[in-house]
Structures are given as structure tokens and as C-alpha cells.
Amino acid sequence: MKLGIKLINDVSGLKFDNQSIKIIKKYNIPFVIHHIQGKPSTMQKNPKYENVLLDIYDYFVERIKYVRFSGVKHNNIIIDPGIGFGKNLKHNITLISKISLFHSLGFPVLIGISRKRFIKDISRKNDSKERLGGTIGSSLFAIMQGVQILRVHNVNEVIQSIKIFKELLKK
């Protein structure tokens, strides 16, 4: 915290390290409950869900109960469905297209879609630096769904696209 950390993004949803919750409570800082199926080393080995939306929704309900019971303040919680973390193309597209479901949980929604593999799978652009168009398109769609926080690489380009998009919506 001496380094000026303003937010913790725990890709495990506080499952891999039981010390994280203590730090979050001690310093009273916002953190992201991130969804992942499995562990980083196994997450992409044939990911399966009964219903990707409802399974992840239920995961958030469970994790939110845990962190609230542990004493974390409501306004310090952000949720991230974890695009690309234990999900195939169909899962990712379903999550992005229906992400507004997660607003009913009552927390800000963060989505990290910048340069992701699903953009590669659709656009056939292998070089991650060639996925800006897909990142911008996905970001604008997420904004339309009410997503409050975007995690992106090309910050200026995404901000510009959002400004133009919002201005056009006014007319």
C-alpha cells in the first residue's frame, strides 16, 4: 500500500490466497472479484458450464456473501466475469452479450476485453496489437450494456471512441 495501490484485482476471487482478504479489510481498498474456472494452468482445458451466465452469477453470489461476511464493505466490491479465464468463444460471447444480468447483484461491473483471444477467434488477427478494432467494438457494446469499468491497453483510443459514441447517442 506504500506504493500507492488503489485497487486489488484478484483473478481467483479470493480463493488462491487467504491473506488477500486481510489486506483488503486492513487498508479498506476496492477490489475486483474475478471469475475463473479452474486455475491459470488448467482454465482453458475444455471449460464447461451448465449455463455460463447463471453459473457465474451463482459464483458471484457465493463470493459476495463470503467477502461481506468477512467484513469487506459493500462499496469496495467490483465484479468481473473473467472473459477468457476458463471460457471458450461461445462462453465469452454469451457473457459479453448478456453482461447486464450482473448489474442485479448491485456492484460495479468491470470487464477486461482488450486484445482478448475471442477477438482473435472472430477476426483471425493473430497479433494482439492488431485487435484494436475488436477491442473498441466490444468496449462500446459493453458500455451499452451498462458496464462501468473497462480494462484496456489502448486507453486513449478507447476513451476517444466512447466520447464519440456517447455524443452520437445524444442526437
Language model features by range: what are they?
Residues 83:
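Active-site metal-binding loops of divalent metal-dependent hydrolases
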